[in-house]
Amino acid sequence: MASRAFAAVFAAVALVVCSSVLPRALASDPSQLQDFCVADKLSAVFVNGFVCKNPKQVTANDFFLPKALGVPGNTVNAQGSAVTPVTVNELPGLNTLGISFARIDFAPNGQNPPHTHPRATEILTVLQGTLLVGFVTSNQPGGGNLQFTKLLGPGDVFVFPQGLIHFQLNNGAVPAVAIAALSSQNPGVITIANAVFGSTPPILDDVLAKAFMIDKDQVDWIQAKFAAPPAASGGGGGFIGGGGGGGFPGGGAP
């Protein structure tokens, strides 16, 4: 009897500990187990992230990216925006540190189109100009989705929760600049329009026509807009959103 009681208590304690630890473990990048783990881009080993470079071969340059955010991005594209990312792909020293950075430039009326970061929360501050920003919640119990939006000026800060669709729009007459930080070394980005209408191979017309309640001809017309390469279709790819092309950094979105 005593052993059964002990087993029951042990199981209960283990359940409580696991329930408190697992959410934190699953909700962020893996925790570092050493001072640093500089990404070894030359390794042929595939892991969740990057394997570590030999510490004896690490130099200060592995943690340094000169003038990374000092040069304005090219906003001459369909979306009128450009993203300059600083993720583990650009700065190997970020590996296992759970953070990344980006500069977003906006032409007048330019936007970072609706997109989501599946692996990160984003916090953004405006350096120049004004931005209309917002995010949309997941499906609500009673149906529908809520939108939270705000007009930001220089020095204002706004946060976009992990995984939720969000956007930024320069509704001013002058260029705008913002800086974003994200809670992952590699946040990922899904640009909604690109993913839905520009996937390879394309999603079936029947699926999209029914989902958007439009005709198949209209689906074909929209899909044709996303058939061009990212450089031609605008927005680029990238860290933040991307305009008529896909990606985490590059042309349109953190």
From Swiss-Prot:
SMART domains associated with the record: Cupin_1
CDD domains (UniProt xref):
cupin_OxOx
Disulfide bridges in this chain? C37-C52
Query: Keyword Cell wall biogenesis/degradation on this protein?
Result: no
Q: Name one Pfam family in it.
A: Cupin_1
Protein name per its UniProtKB record: Germin-like protein 4-1
Give the record's family classification. Answer: Belongs to the germin family.
Any single Gene Ontology cellular-component annotation: apoplast
Domain Cupin type-1: where? Answer: 67-220
Q: Which InterPro entries match?
A: Cupin_1, Germin, Germin_Mn-BS, RmlC-like_jellyroll, RmlC_Cupin_sf
Assembly: Oligomer (believed to be a pentamer but probably hexamer).
Signal peptide residue numbers: 1-27
Q: What is its main location?
A: secreted
The protein's location, in the record's own words, is: Secreted, Extracellular space, Apoplast
* Task performed by this protein: May play a role in plant defense. Probably has no oxalate oxidase activity even if the active site is conserved.
Molecular function via GO? manganese ion binding
Q: Which residues bind Mn(2+)?
A: H115, H117, E122, H166
Keywords in alphabetical order: Apoplast, Disulfide bond, Manganese, Metal-binding, Secreted, Signal
Highest taxon above the source species: Eukaryota
